[in-house]
Structure formats: structure tokens, C-alpha cells
């Protein structure tokens, strides 16, 4: 994605990937590069409160401190579920009910469906046009309301992080062939 939108929604999976030591070096580089680009472009990166709560469930005190540090960055926006988000959620739920299936053809537990929709509704109410999530349900809900869905792995990998692939040719073994010693001929 060459140009970042003005408002971008992320979820708990993004937050976990950002802080986890288990995240691959390439994915860490993608996230760092994305955040640098977002700050430079003056995009607003939206961290919805339900996603923050989901992250904090498994985080220790360091997780709270991390969130406090993020809160100080002006391009990061910690977003509540407010009246505008409630309106957007009602539109998402109504569309699902109009199809005759409030779960919208997903087998997920109803509580997960509601939280995923709340996350998307918060982003939609703040003008997000892109969501970054590893959760297919969040991305699908985002698509239904006209947002683009991406995973961390689909973010641009910065040039500095790209490893040069060397084509190494294995050495051939020469079984049964002995080197021949060639003596110089004496010419003089």
C-alpha cells in the first residue's frame, strides 16, 4: 500500500504482535515500518478499547505501561465505544439480521461476534478505511462496511529488513578421483 489512509484500525492481534517476543523479525519490521509511515503521513492509528481490554487480559503490568507509552503518541488514538460507534454497530447488526442470520453465517460464539463487530464499529465511526488484523472475522466485518482488511504479513517489509538471498551451489564431491601431481618439466 503506497499511501496510507488517514484513519487505520488495528485490533488485539496487532497489539500482541507488536509487543510479543515470539513475533518474527520480519513481522516486527513490518509493524515498526507501518507505524513510522503512519506517523510521518499523519494518519490516525485507532486502538479500540475492546481490543485493548483483550490485550490486557493476558498482559502483566508491563502491558499497562506499554499502553501508557502508546497513549502519549499523538498519531495513536485510544478509542472508546461511544454513541457514533453504537450507531455503526446497529447498522452492522441490522444488515446481518436482514439476511435472516444474526451471526452472519459464522460459527463463532455470539460474544466473539459482538466484540468483533464493536471493534469494527469503533473504527468505522472514526473514519477508518483500513483494518489490520489476523482475525478473519474482524476483516470480514470490515469488508462488509466498506473497509479494506489486511494482516500484518501483508504490510510492506522495509528494504533494510529484506534479507538478500544468496544462491549457494553445493560443492560437488569427486568420489574415486585422486588428484594428479604434475611435476614441472625442467627446461633449463
Predicted regions mapped to residue ranges:
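Short active-site oxyanion
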Residues: 41-45, 74-77, 125-130
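Phosphate- and divalent-cation-binding pockets in alpha/beta enzyme and binding domains
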Residues: 54-55, 88, 140-141
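A general structural signal for well-ordered alpha-helical segments in protein cores
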Residues: 31, 52, 86-89, 116
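Acidic catalytic patch
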Residues: 75-109
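Alpha-helix capping/helix-boundary segments
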Residues: 14, 51, 85, 118-119, ...
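Acidic, PIN/NYN-like endoribonuclease modules and their adjacent C-terminal/linker elements
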Residues: 1-5, 120-188
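Short, well-structured N-terminal submotif of metal-dependent ribonuclease cores
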Residues: 1-47, 56-73, 164-188
Amino acid at each position: 500500500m503506497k499511501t496510507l489512509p488517514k484513519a487505520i484500525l488495528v485490533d488485539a492481534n496487532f497489539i500482541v504482535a507488536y509487543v510479543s517476543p515470539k513475533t518474527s523479525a520480519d513481522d516486527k519490521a513490518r509493524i515498526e515500518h507501518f507505524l513510522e509511515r503512519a506517523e510521518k503521513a499523519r494518519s490516525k492509528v485507532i486502538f479500540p478499547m475492546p481490543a485493548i481490554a483483550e490485550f490486557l487480559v493476558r498482559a502483566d503490568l508491563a502491558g499497562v505501561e506499554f499502553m501508557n507509552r502508546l497513549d502519549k503518541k499523538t498519531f495513536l488514538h485510544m478509542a472508546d465505544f461511544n454513541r457514533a460507534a453504537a450507531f455503526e454497530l446497529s447498522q452492522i447488526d441490522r444488515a446481518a439480521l436482514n439476511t435472516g442470520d444474526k451471526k452472519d453465517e459464522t460459527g463463532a460464539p455470539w460474544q466473539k461476534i459482538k466484540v468483533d463487530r464493536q471493534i469494527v464499529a469503533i473504527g468505522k465511526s472514526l473514519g477508518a478505511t483500513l483494518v489490520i488484523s489476523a482475525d478473519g472475522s474482524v476483516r470480514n466485518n470490515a469488508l462488509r462496511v466498506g473497509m479494506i482488511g489486511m494482516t500484518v504479513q501483508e504490510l510492506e517489509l522495509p528494504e533494510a529488513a529484506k534479507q538478500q538471498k544468496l544462491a549457494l551451489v553445493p560443492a560437488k564431491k569427486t568420489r574415486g578421483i585422486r588428484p594428479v601431481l604434475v611435476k614441472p618439466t625442467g627446461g633449463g
